[in-house]
Amino acid sequence: MAAQGFLLIATFLLVLMVLARPLGSGLARLINDIPLPGTAGVERVLFRLPGVSDSEMNWKQYLCAILGLNMLGLAVLFFMLLGQHYLPLNPQQLPGLSWDLALNTAVSFVTNTNWQSYSGETTLSYFSQMAGLTVQNFLSAASGIAVIFALIRAFTRQSMSTLGNAWVDLLRITLWVLAPVALLIALFFIQQGALQNFLPYQAVTTIEGSQQLLPMGPVASQEAIKMLGTNGGGFFNANSSHPFENPTALTNFVQMLAIFLIPTALCFAFGEVAGDRRQGRMLLWAMSVIFVICVGVVMWAEVQGNPHLLALGADSSINMEGKESRFGVLVSSLFAVVTTAASCGAVIAMHDSFTALGGMVPMWLMQIGEVVFGGVGSGLYGMMLFVLLAVFIAGLMIGRTPEYLGKKIDVREMKLTALAILVTPTLVLMGAALAMMTDAERSAMLNPGPHGFSEVLYAVSSAANNNGSAFAGLSANSPFWNCLLALCMFVGRFGVIIPVMAIAGSLVSKKSQPASSGTLPTHGPLFVGLLIGTVLLVGALTFIPALALGPVAEYLS
């Protein structure tokens, strides 16, 4: 079993790196404001028609463009879900959503979280899925990538005030990166058996002779961008464990690759744009080390079986509860770590049914800020915050002003870095405390004791860090939970983007200083270890008390 797990991890990472390297070169061209071959003419026409200026923006203008697009998308999606029953492509005549569920869902998809307090096949029409959710899957992913584009330019430009043009970046990312790759993935899914139709739900007779209603819909097109954009919201309630979304072992492998593809490519692109590919490899090494250790822990925990079942005399040599037998325990463990290391949230197994340690690792990966590969764009700019913090700590130890890529890191940057890093832990801990204060909110827990608290802690961790997966034992479709989680998702997304853009605006105006004998190398194994230690230290100091009340207490009981 250990050899199989090692081979699975190694194969996954090898194929991932092979695919991400050329994509990273293409992204580097876009960051350097070089159109991809054959696209410049199309871009000129698309900007000329609405009269949009393609001149460069400062950080405030860039930020306002990103926020404006997302706020407009939030309003459109909210009213679309409320009035779903008036819109076309609703063969099941599904009603509009309640205001709190519509708000939660709109915020969820605009923030790239895709938390779902509903069952897709019984709640949303084809129009809502396509024109509402799928569109936001593209736009939220493009927004995250645009922010990291701006931050990378801030490190590589000198004595400037502009970071590029948000509309140019969003257009290029959507048209030349997300759309073509998602199309290829969708066609592959269709070839493998994923649904893509507009038929009404089909009544069929099962082999036992009973009647069953099979849901239909344009699944493959949404599934592709759901994975590629690290969105994660399933067309069906069972998400990627549903055979209509994820029909074969091959589609499952491609889904895992799609989740990590752009975050990995962005690391390669960062090194190329910075003029030192070792910088990108340093980030990949740090992410990969944490990732491999986490996968190993989850695989080990799930292979050990459920000790509570063993105590009752049941055969539980491995923990298969809540897992698809066609994927097995090792693949389910790998997928769980992939989807929570990235801010995806898609699942092929029920994380609520994992062992105490097996469920704690995905929760902890979210709590440290989704920086182990992370979401498209958001993962890398989240890790860059820890890079700045690690550089600052190293500067304190050697008595020098911290610098990164030749840029001095001053008090302003460190204050903004601390603010951005503290946003999500504050939301998680305060949200969990608020949810545990009254009987009404605690009644949403379907399990007592430490595991019930773990369900609450997982939910707010998932929402605040824009992941979207859940311990499904929590009944979250209530006004309190919909509003609380919507607030966590909104602040967790934009409360980090705003200081990140402010950091970019500060750095882009600085000159790059040449390296000296006292400059800390940020591309070697020493800095990789320092960066990993910084991530672990912040995660440990912040969440160990809360984890001790949940999964740790459950493991020890």
From Swiss-Prot:
It comes from the Bacteria. InterPro entries: KdpA. It is a multi-pass membrane protein. The keyword Translocase does not apply. Its main location: membrane. The chain crosses the membrane at residues 5-25, 63-83, 132-152, 170-190, 253-273, 283-303, 329-349, 356-376, 379-399, 416-436, 484-504, 526-546. It is found in: Cell inner membrane. Keywords: Cell inner membrane, Cell membrane, Ion transport, Membrane, Potassium, Potassium transport, Transmembrane, Transmembrane helix, Transport. GO terms for cellular component: plasma membrane. GO terms for molecular function: P-type potassium transmembrane transporter activity; potassium ion binding. Part of the high-affinity ATP-driven potassium transport (or Kdp) system, which catalyzes the hydrolysis of ATP coupled with the electrogenic transport of potassium into the cytoplasm. This subunit binds the periplasmic potassium ions and delivers the ions to the membrane domain of KdpB through an intramembrane tunnel. HAMAP family: KdpA. Belongs to the KdpA family. The system is composed of three essential subunits: KdpA, KdpB and KdpC. This is Potassium-transporting ATPase potassium-binding subunit. It comes from Escherichia coli O81 (strain ED1a).
